[in-house]
Design a protein with these regions (language model features):
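Expand to "…catalyze enediolate/carbanion chemistry for C-C bond making/breaking, isomerization
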Residues: 1-178
């Protein structure tokens, strides 16, 4: 599959699942404004993947027109535990490089599993993507969006309730239809 095809599938997942289920009430606006950047990282080497993550932070530094960036790993981190290692290293790198409070890291994986949850819990599908990916968001933009959103702390609970109400079969079908 080409990078373009991977990006197209990722965009469809964002449109159909993230926006369609309203998991992120702010996503529709940045997609509509076309201020999302997508980067496919083909390597499977951890160091190269971290270098790519650092490059994405610098890309956001250099391009104010980009609100958010998805770094997609179609060939790496097939095991969720390996992916969690990447997330931990990326979060540490974000802090070490002075980006804490500047960028926020969100994580998505095909086998995403919330702590203390069962693998068949439909709530996991709020973060189950079609590829392992890291999502960088500008903290300033998040803060601005939250100013106009009533009860932002309720978003995760609303998402979990939605997924559980729809059920495992529906959430799995929605994601796997891509």
């Amino acid at each position: 599959m080409t990078s373009e095809q991977i990006i197209d599938r990722t965009k469809k997942w964002i449109t159909d699942v993230v926006i369609g289920c309203n998991f992120c009430p702010f996503a529709a606006n940045v997609v509509k404004q076309q201020t999302v950047f997508y980067k496919v990282e083909e390597t499977t080497e951890m160091d190269a993947c971290l270098d790519s993550f650092v490059h994405e932070m610098k890309r956001l530094d250099d391009n104010a027109s980009i609100e958010t960036s998805f770094l997609i790993f179609p060939n790496a981190f097939q095991k969720f535990d390996d992916y969690l290692d990447l997330v931990s290293l990326a979060e540490n790198r974000l802090k070490r490089d002075g980006y804490e409070g500047v960028y926020q890291l969100a994580s998505f994986h095909p086998l995403y599993l919330f702590e203390n949850s069962d693998e068949n819990d439909p709530a996991n599908y709020t973060n189950r993507s079609i590829y392992p990916m890291l999502h960088l968001l500008r903290e300033e933009s998040i803060d601005k969006a939250l100013e106009n959103y009533k009860s932002p702390e309720s978003i995760p609970f609303r998402n979990i309730n939605f997924a559980k109400e729809k059920g495992l079969a529906y959430m799995k079908m929605l994601r796997d239809a891509l």
